Amino acid sequence: MTENSTSTPAAKPKRAKASKKSTDHPKYSDMIVAAIQAEKNRAGSSRQSIQKYIKSHYKVGENADSQIKLSIKRLVTTGVLKQTKGVGASGSFRLAKSDEPKRSVAFKKTKKEVKKVATPKKAAKPKKAASKAPSKKPKATPVKKAKKKPAATPKKTKKPKTVKAKPVKASKPKKTKPVKPKAKSSAKRTGKKK
């Protein structure tokens, strides 16, 4: 019972005010929404075009311009309309319901594109660094760097080993040659003593 008693007195003064101003047209918010839907501009409809539509289709009083400005601001603050251009009541306006799904899809596409573009850039940098030293294998950069260092060191050590080995082999036969005649002379001496 309390809900009905509070709602009925609030509705009566609204009807009285509307009847005094004009009973031939609906609410300004409804007329503005109808004007935007009728124009169907992708860029949005301006306040002047909304005023022309309302004046041509509805019987509006002299204060229609000021009422349209106020109602446009209210619709923008409540979220029914979205302002695409301009500030305040000036500029172009769209219905928020039709724009929300389109914009959300557009933002998702741009995020995916940014991620795709960022990944090849990161992969391209290590390829350039790897291609400078070994041109054959430009794929796994961290593994290559570890392999390059040990591969370079044994090459340096092999060269001095080959140089040292040659004089050692040549010196061995020289030492063995003078040993043989000494053994022969000792054998001759033993034969003479007998």
UniProtKB/Swiss-Prot annotation:
Residues 1-11 have a biased composition (Low complexity). Gene3D superfamilies: Winged helix-like DNA-binding domain superfamily/Winged helix DNA-binding domain. It holds the Pfam family Linker_histone. The keyword Acetylation applies. Keywords: Acetylation, ADP-ribosylation, Chromosome, Citrullination, DNA-binding, Nucleus. PROSITE patterns: H15. Belongs to the histone H1/H5 family. This is Histone H1.0. It comes from Bos taurus. The lineage of its organism: Eukaryota, Metazoa, Chordata, Craniata, Vertebrata. The gene is H1-0.
